[in-house]
Curated annotation (Swiss-Prot):
The keyword RNA-binding does not apply. Transmembrane segments: none annotated. It comes from Chlamydia abortus (strain DSM 27085 / S26/3) (Chlamydophila abortus). The keyword rRNA processing does not apply. This is Large ribosomal subunit protein bL32. Pfam families: Ribosomal_L32p.
Length: 60
């Protein structure tokens, strides 16, 4: 099994991990109701997906 011969500094460790942060979720705009929603999912405000009514949403 591989064992490191020399200690890695904190700076070197942090530089290596600089790309490990969570990325922000992108938002798309619904063509039916113009509300923001997560891409490739059903719009939670109107229930449309890809221009078709997939589910019914109760209006408050």
């Amino acid at each position: 099994m591989a064992v490191p011969r020399n200690r890695h500094s904190n700076a070197r460790k942090n530089i290596r991990r600089s790309h490990h942060a969570k990325q922000a979720r992108h938002a798309a705009v619904c063509n039916n109701c113009k509300q923001a929603f997560i891409p490739h999912t059903v719009c939670t405000s109107c229930g449309f997906y890809n221009g078709k009514a997939v589910m019914t949403v109760e209006k408050k």
